[in-house]
């Protein structure tokens, strides 16, 4: 009955504050576990070494009590392993992983039209559907009653999306 929400560390306090605001009378607790757990990106090939079954979006497996899952937004982003902070180095060593500059991951993400960092400029100025959340399976059009649902549904229904974050490739 637990869920893990991954986000930029600098946004954690604000996200927990918003979630607590919107939970109303629900019997739900939001806890900051960023000092205990860490997420690391691994390649899809490494995921296939851990789990030999068919790879699909959101596929989850277990590696030494650490959940490992294919990024549900886009399979080209690879997979992630979530580990206790004190155990991550052991997992990295046993999986024979290499450290790579996180800019490489963010660049790949941006190439796929998946914004991840420094979105402060867009705060309160863009709907989730304009931020590609529908493409990333982050909006459920069958579920009602969520913040912004009326506008998001209207945009989708009328096919009136006027702006969207898109990847741009520079040709030299």
Where are these regions (language model features)?
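Basic, glycine/lysine-rich polyanion-binding surfaces/domains
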Residues: 1-172
